[in-house]
Amino acid sequence: MALKSGEERLKEMEAEMALFEQEVLGGPVAPTVVEAVPVALAMPTLPMVRPIIGTNTYREVQQSLEARAATLVGPPPTFVCPAIPAVPPPQVLRPAFVPHVLQRPAGGHRMPMMRGPPPHGMIAPPLPRPPPPPPSMMAPPVVGPPQPPMAPVGPPMGPMPPVGGMNPMALGPPRSMTQAPAKITPSVIQAAPTVYTAPPVSKRIDLKSQKQARMEQLSALVAEQQAAVLAAGLLDSKKETASDDSVIGPSMPEPEPVHVEPVDTSTEDKKKGKQEKVKKCIRVAAGVSWEDTSLLEWETDDFRIFCGDLGNEVNDDILARAFSRYPSFLKAKVVRDKRTGKTKGYGFVSFKDPNDYVRAMREMNGRYVGSRPIKLRKSAWKDRNLEVVRKNQKEKKKLGLR
């Protein structure tokens, strides 16, 4: 196999670089001189022919590409730096690579900027243009800030002179889009409305009227009581005179009868009714005492049963019908809410005979009254009475429990 030394390779590379620089600068190109390369037969094998690329290959390929592009596309437009629009529209995603041919001004709003021709000696041959893609594959014109120029293909070229005749508007700094400041709505801090109430009116007048009415009632009661006492005294005196008539002997002259105003019987009836209503049922529980007027409807010496788990449809009649087969049955009542009138789910049944009480506890416990089975137990209504509570407290004190 033919092998080259490092010096020969370096010489070939320098020669190729010199020819390439001459082609780029546009100078005359010397005919290519192919030096004879000594071939050293290291082994008795067939020599390997290595193709050598000539220096004019680049120019020939470039000319063929230019001729082909001229038949497909017209003369290339002069490169114009795209002007920056006053108000940039929303950004569009830019493809990874867009040729310079496709970077044309959109909408015809950009004016082509002319620049002076560079010196003939420094111009570089135009690069071959690729054939344009079909219309279906054409990318939409990209609107946005100007892209930096693409790097040249191939070895680096010499320094280029500054381009003259450029429009200063095209190369000016991009104008910042002035946005109208957002309208700031002022925050209003509002205090809570103050309510002015009228000063409380003194109730001295009402209190005075109430006191006067109370005094009138008390005076009327006192007058009634005095009249009743006088009537009772007259009756007693009449009885004494009757007993004196039975005595034998001289009798004293009878005194003249004293005319007393007749007393209304209605006042006496009211007094008796008030004396009967003096009886109160005071209950005590959790350190609180109150008067329970509902206990006055029941007899104090009866045998009472507590009936629990009653349905909403059970009333006094249904409960009385369930226990009316016992001969000593007295009363049945379902406890209801005073405000709404709904049942509280329990009630009471009373008997006069203790035997009927025991039979009802044994037979009716768990029976259906309405839509639910009834639950019975002994009523402990006496344990909450004030007298019983005080008696129990005294007994506990004697025993030393409290």
Swiss-Prot record:
Any single GO CC term annotated in Swiss-Prot or TrEMBL for this entry: nucleus
PROSITE patterns xref list: RRM
SUPFAM superfamilies assigned: RNA-binding domain, RBD
Pfam families per UniProt: RRM_1
Location in the cell: Nucleus; Cytoplasm
Domain of life: Eukaryota
Domain annotation RRM: ranges: 303-381
Biased composition, class Basic and acidic residues, residue ranges: 256-275
Molecular function (Gene Ontology), one example: mRNA binding
Keyword list, A-Z: Cytoplasm, Nucleus, RNA-binding
Keyword check for DNA damage: no
Annotated spans, Disordered: 240-275
One Gene Ontology term from the biological process aspect of the record: lens development in camera-type eye
Any coiled-coil regions, as ranges: none
Keyword Nucleus assigned: yes
Task performed by this protein: May bind RNA.
Family recorded in the similarity comment: Belongs to the RRM RBM42 family.
Protein name stated in the entry: RNA-binding protein 42
Organism per entry: Danio rerio (Zebrafish)
